[in-house]
């Protein structure tokens, strides 16, 4: 994969919006997973912390930790895209992410569900500050992170 053009402005938009969301992680973690289940109710079975629950648990530390990881890694990816022109995640981290997603039964369309939930959560959290530029920056960063994980999953399969 060649170098990706990710601007300083895009990086700043991702970082600034993440700072806003970080101020109420419990709320936005819950919103994020509620969105995933609204878009794809069957996805519930992919998350160990959701399987045995009829609703998204409010005070589940695993739920919060997973949501934070998705947002934080996407934010870090934005920084890497701007600085390096590519996703720079440690091989061991990518191997782990590829392995865990493969074992959990995650397939390509699931990444789109997570992306849509991520964007809906950003829209909810940012209110009037959410716009096409913010959406585009987060989308591009997330797409590259998802591609890196999917590539690792394919390598693990073969």
From Swiss-Prot:
A motif (Homodimerization) lies at residues 38-42, 108-120. GO terms for cellular component: cytosol; nucleus. One of its GO terms (biological process) is triglyceride biosynthetic process. Transmembrane segments: none annotated. Its cofactor is heme b. Expressed in rosette leaves but not in roots. GO terms for molecular function: heme binding; metal ion binding; oxidoreductase activity; oxygen binding; oxygen carrier activity. InterPro entries: Globin, Globin-like_sf, Globin/Proto, Leghaemoglobin-like, Leghaemoglobin_Fe_BS. It catalyses: Fe(III)-heme b-[protein] + nitric oxide + H2O = Fe(II)-heme b-[protein] + nitrite + 2 H(+). The keyword Nucleus applies. Binds 1 heme group per subunit. Its main location: cytoplasm. Its EC number is 1.7.2.-. It is found in: Cytoplasm; Nucleus. It is an enzyme of class 1 (oxidoreductase). Residues 5-154 form the Globin domain. Induction: By low temperature but not by low oxygen levels, dehydration, heat shock, wounding or oxidative stress. Belongs to the plant globin family. Phytoglobin that reduces nitrite to nitric oxide (NO) under anoxic conditions (e.g. during flooding or in waterlogged soil). May not function as an oxygen storage or transport protein. Has an unusually high affinity for O(2) through an hexacoordinate heme iron because of a very low dissociation constant. Unable to dimerize. This is Anaerobic nitrite reductase AHB2. It comes from Arabidopsis thaliana (Mouse-ear cress). The gene is AHB2.
């Amino acid at each position: 994969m060649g170098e990706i053009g990710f601007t300083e402005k895009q990086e700043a938009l991702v970082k600034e919006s993440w700072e806003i969301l970080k101020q109420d992680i419990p709320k936005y973690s819950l919103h994020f997973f509620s969105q995933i289940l609204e878009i794809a109710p069957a996805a519930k079975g992919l998350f160990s912390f959701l399987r045995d629950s009829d609703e998204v648990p409010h005070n589940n530390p695993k739920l919060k930790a997973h949501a934070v990881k998705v947002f934080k890694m996407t934010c870090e990816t934005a920084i890497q895209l701007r600085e390096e022109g590519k996703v720079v995640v440690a091989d061991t981290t990518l191997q782990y992410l590829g392995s865990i997603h493969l074992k959990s039964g995650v397939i390509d369309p699931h990444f789109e569900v997570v992306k849509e939930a991520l964007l809906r959560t950003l829209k909810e959290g940012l209110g009037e500050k959410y716009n096409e530029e913010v959406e585009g920056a987060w989308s591009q960063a997330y797409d590259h992170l998802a591609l890196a994980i999917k590539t690792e999953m394919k390598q693990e399969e073969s």
